[in-house]
Regions:
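N-terminal signal-anchor transmembrane helix
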Residues: 2-4, 66-128, 136, 295-300, ...
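Membrane-embedded segments
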Residues: 118-172
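Soluble, non-transmembrane catalytic domains of enzymes that act on hydrophobic metabolites at membranes
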Residues: 1-37, 96-101, 123, 202-203, ...
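A cross-family acyltransferase "interaction/gating" segment
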Residues: 145-147, 162, 195-270, 278
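Catalytic-site beta-strand/loop segments enriched in glycine and acidic/polar residues
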Residues: 176-205
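Generic beta-sheet signal
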Residues: 109-115, 155, 181-187
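A transmembrane-helix-recognition feature enriched in membrane-embedded lipid enzymes
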Residues: 33-96, 148-153
Length: 307
């Protein structure tokens, strides 16, 4: 086991990149500041094995996606959840999925699933809880591997730099929800390192109000062998997908904790801002009495297209 040690630099000055519209969400998290620290690493052979296994699992999922879509909904859901749990496990991440005592059964039918956003791993982690269509920025479609994966999953894309396209996107989400389909959104609109959270943007919550469906909050946390929140899985700032992948496969004892929190009835809130605040409080606050559901198993880098 090798111990990686880097001094943590001073907090970065938050600057919005030139030419980026002021309404686009951004986070102060950067690789140089948030990813510095000390964590144990596995040896090179295990890293190579993890990379190869992870890429193989993703490739199998891409190849079988057309066949899985032809299956009955119940079987399709089981296969998708099993594959989604296998992806992080293949990259060396232990997965723990929990359901808060008050949450009861996992959601079915039309529901707006909202989660905090830290890493590209968030995508399969949420799918392991509830397979659903996802809202993502249009740039994700061109990402290597991940782009093809989310595109085949029926992702709803949005051009974030075109503010006028937002109402149409909200209407599309509401249409999917009315038809009984779940939709996943990362309402922070950008990835954060996991030690802090961003504000939940209210726009997409209008879709839940229009469709009359509940909001399902999900909390995602990454830890190293039960320690405080770890940033090894974070995909922030000017980080590249390759650098993030290599960091994940090198980490020893990385655990992803996914907690399903009690659903929030949209009708209990007068407007989207109130609903967004309620969802944010649920996610950023400590979960109440979670129970195990499954065993182990400033440049925006998020996938979300939320404004």
């Amino acid at each position: 086991m090798r111990l990686l040690t880097r001094p943590a630099p001073a907090a970065p000055e938050v600057r919005r990149p030139a030419g980026v519209p002021h309404w686009l969400p951004s986070a102060p998290c950067t690789p140089g500041h948030c990813l510095a620290g000390t964590h144990a690493e596995v040896g090179l052979p295990r890293r190579v094995a993890r990379c190869a296994t992870g890429i193989a699992v993703v490739a199998v999922g891409l190849a079988l996606a057309p066949l899985v879509r032809c299956c009955r909904p119940a079987l399709r859901g089981r296969l998708t959840r099993a594959w989604a749990r296998a992806v992080p496990a293949a990259f060396g991440v232990r997965v723990r999925i929990r359901v808060s005592g008050a949450a009861g059964r996992l959601p079915t039918g039309g529901v707006l699933v909202v989660a905090n956003h830290i890493s590209w791993l968030d995508i399969p982690l949420v799918a392991a809880v509830r397979p659903a269509r996802m809202l993502a920025k249009s740039e994700v479609a061109s990402w290597p591997v991940l782009g093809a994966l989310v595109s085949r999953g029926g992702t709803l894309f949005i051009e974030r730099d075109r503010l006028r396209s937002l109402p149409a996107t909200v209407a599309r989400i509401a249409s999917v929800l009315r038809a009984g389909g779940p939709v996943v959104v990362f309402p922070e609109g950008s990835t954060w390192c996991g030690r802090r959270h961003g504000r939940f943007r209210p726009a997409v919550f209008q879709a839940a109000l229009d469709a009359g469906v509940a909001v399902q909050p999900v909390l995602i946390r990454y830890r190293l062998q039960g320690a405080d929140p770890a940033t090894a899985a974070a995909f922030v700032g000017e980080d590249t997908l390759l650098a993030s992948l290599l960091r994940v496969t090198a980490a020893r004892g990385l655990v992803a904790e996914v907690t399903v929190l009690p659903p929030i009835p949209s009708g209990a809130h007068p407007d989207r801002r109130s609903l967004a605040r309620a969802a944010q409080r649920a996610v950023t606050g400590p979960p109440s009495g979670p129970q195990d559901r499954h065993g182990p198993g400033p440049q925006d880098r998020g996938v979300s297209g939320v404004n």
